[in-house]
Amino acid sequence: MAELPGQIRHIGGRMSQLLEQIYGFSRRSLFRVISMGPIPCHIAFIMDGNRRYAKKCGLLDGSGHKAGFSALMSMLQYCYELGIKYVTIYAFSIDNFRRKPEEVESVMDLMLEKIKSLLEKESIVHQYGIRVYFIGNLALLNDQVRAAAEKVMKATAKNSRVVLLICIAYNSTDEIVQAVKKSCINKSDNIEASNYKHEDSDSDIEGTDMENQEKKIQLVDIEENMQMSVAPNPDILIRSSGETRLSNFLLWQTGNTQLCSPAALWPEIGLRHLLWAILNFQRNHSYLEKRKKQL
C-alpha cells in the first residue's frame, strides 16, 4: 500500500504528458488549416493589463508581470509554430519610468532575470533559433539590464530563423526624434565629404539638380535610421485588455496595420485571441495589400 501514492503520481504524470501531446497535435493540425490562408510576417503586441490582473486575482505586486511573462512565452511559441517570422513586444515604455521607484525597480529586476534566462539551453531562443533585438533608448536602463540585453543580442546575432524585437525604454516619439537626428548628422557628413571632393578637384561648377536633391533629407533617410528598420512593418498589432490606444508605440510603422483589442488582460491572453486576430487579418488581407501599394 505504501507504493500506491507513488504509482498514482506516476500515472498522473503519464496522463499529463498524454494530454499535452494530444493538445500539441490538435494545435498543429489547426495551424495547418489556418496556414491555408495568408499568414502575417510580423505581429506586434502591447502587453497591457499585468497590474490589473494582479489586483483582480489578489496577487502581490509584481506577480502580474510574472504571469504576463508566462503568457508571452506561450504566445511566442504559437507565433513561431505558425511560421510568423517577426514578433515585437512592448515591454517597457520610457513613460513607465515615471511610476513609483519601487515598482520600476521590481520590473527591472524581473526583466534582468528573464533576459538572462533567454541564454539558457532550454530557453525558447535556442528552441527556435531566435535572433533577439532590444529596441529603445538602452542608455536609460541600469548597467546590469543594459549589459544583459547587449549580451543576448551578441549571442543571438547569427540566428536567422525567426526574430524577436523587445521594445524596452522605448516610445515612438523618441525613436522618430533619434532617427531624424541621425539623418541630419549623416547628411551633414555626406555634404562635407562632397564639398571636400569638389575643392580637391578645383571644380567651380555648380552642383547638379541631383546633387542638390541629395543634400535634402528624404523619407528613406529617416526610415533607414529608425531602430525598427531591422523588421518589416507589422501586419497585426494586438493590444490586450480591450484598450484601443497605441500608447506611443510604433506610430511610424502602423499606418497600414490590422489592429486587434481583445478584452482579456495580458496574462489571460491565449491561442484563441491570436487565431481570431489572424482570421480577421486574412479576411481583410486583399484590402490591406491594396492600401500598401497606394502608399
Swiss-Prot record:
Pfam families cross-referenced by the UniProt entry: Prenyltransf
Record keywords: Transferase
CDD domains: Cis_IPPS
GO CC annotation: endoplasmic reticulum
Co-factor(s): Mg(2+)
One of the GO BP terms on file: protein glycosylation
Pathway info: Protein modification; protein glycosylation
Database matches in InterPro entries: UPP_synth-like, UPP_synth-like_CS, UPP_synth-like_sf
EC number: 2.5.1.-
GO MF terms held by the record: transferase activity, transferring alkyl or aryl (other than methyl) groups
Domain of life: Eukaryota
NCBIfam families: uppS (TIGR00055)
Function: Catalyzes cis-prenyl chain elongation to produce the polyprenyl backbone of dolichol, a glycosyl carrier-lipid required for the biosynthesis of several classes of glycoprotein.
Family: Belongs to the UPP synthase family.
Protein name: Dehydrodolichyl diphosphate synthase 6
Organism: Arabidopsis thaliana (Mouse-ear cress)
Taxonomic classification: Eukaryota, Viridiplantae, Streptophyta, Embryophyta, Tracheophyta
